[in-house]
Amino acid sequence: MKSHYRLPGILAAAAATLVTSGIADASASAPDSKPGPSGATAYGWVRNANSAHCLAVPGGSTENGIGLIQWGCGSWRDHYWQFEYAFNSGGRNYYRLRNLNSQQCLAVPGASTTPGTQVIQWPCGTWKDHYWGIEYTNRGTRLVNWNSGQCLAIPGASRVQGEKAIQWPCGTWADHYWNI
């Protein structure tokens, strides 16, 4: 007959469940750090829709400033990236892409706006070239650099392993689309 004493305990347990599940989280309005159903701590491939190769760090290097490439997708740690939500601008969500192996971010060297500049990994910061917007189109998903306004691409729509990843003015070329 002590059920009225259990109610506060039940309510406290329910509230704790809501908070730990993220349902009552104050930041619930911000999207997951990785777009899609994978969740906030998920790392996944950034796979080029044209070549089916993944954005990778050559040799799994942890060196600052190393140029990024495409490579056949595998279980290597340097093939996995986390999307960390940063902000929304002009209706587009922007993220930092953090590499699982090096813990460095996808960046454009020196905040260059020159088409064809190879993208690099660099210690994550708040520089404009570290943020990438997700642009959903009827042809697929593009990653657009906040600083340059250019897309992550593979030159000449190459399907060769080891081809560099670059920024290029956004277009409808097949190598501008990524599966994330």
Where are these predicted regions, by residue range?
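Extracellular glycan-recognition/adhesion modules and their associated mucin-like linkers
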Residues: 31-62, 80-113, 131-159, 177-180
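Short, tandemly repeated low-complexity microdomains enriched for cysteine and small residues
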Residues: 62-83, 112-130, 159-172, 176
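Intrinsic disorder/low-complexity signature
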Residues: 1, 22, 29, 45, ...
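Secretory targeting and sorting signals
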Residues: 1-30
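Low-complexity intrinsically disordered segments
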Residues: 14-17, 38, 114, 123
